[in-house]
Amino acid sequence: QREMKKKGIAVELARTVTATTPTGTGVSVEIGASPFVEVANPPAPRTLEADAVCVTVGRVPHTDGLGLDAAGVKVNARGWIEADDFLETSVPGVYAIGDVIGPRRIMLAHMAVAEAHTAVHNILHPEDRKAQRYDVVPSAIFTAPEIGDVGLSEAQAKQQGFAVKTSVFQFRELGK
């Protein structure tokens, strides 16, 4: 974020675009709190002025036709399958992994593979079930410079009672 800020690029976290309005010189963009990220103090809605807007496409659940209602598997209002921390659905013994469990989890292929391993473990070893961990998955945004993270933020670690020590490594010093 610091490197983006140096380049004059603002990074808005836990936000979503709620409206856009063309202006004579660009576009007015209204942003509000993201429906996909839970934060203690959601940022207040605000309006930004921009030269242009890059639109990215989200995901929708493809659960129609799976017979979830007949099986008794619950889905939320948006159609995502509801699963607990062990990836078990509302029907005991029925597990769900991958994109069908929705955007409150990490929707990437390598995460679905990890979820599959967890679900299979829980099916084969019901006496030793394991919760799927999402706090140790690396994340990256491929911009210049790149933005990435893994694990808890400093604030989250402090909130969970960890003794926190931080240090900084400048990626510009890393050979590519």
Report the location of each language-model feature.
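A conserved beta-strand/loop element that lines the FAD pocket in flavoprotein oxidoreductases
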Residues: 5-17
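Mid-to-C-terminal Rossmann-like scaffold of FAD/NAD(P)H-dependent oxidoreductases
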Residues: 17-19, 28, 59-62, 100-176
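FAD-site-proximal beta/loop scaffold in flavoenzymes
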Residues: 11, 38, 46-126
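Conserved beta-strand-loop-beta-strand element in the redox core of flavoprotein oxidoreductases
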Residues: 21-47, 53
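A structural preference for short, hydrophobic beta-strand core positions in alpha/beta folds
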Residues: 11-13, 31, 166
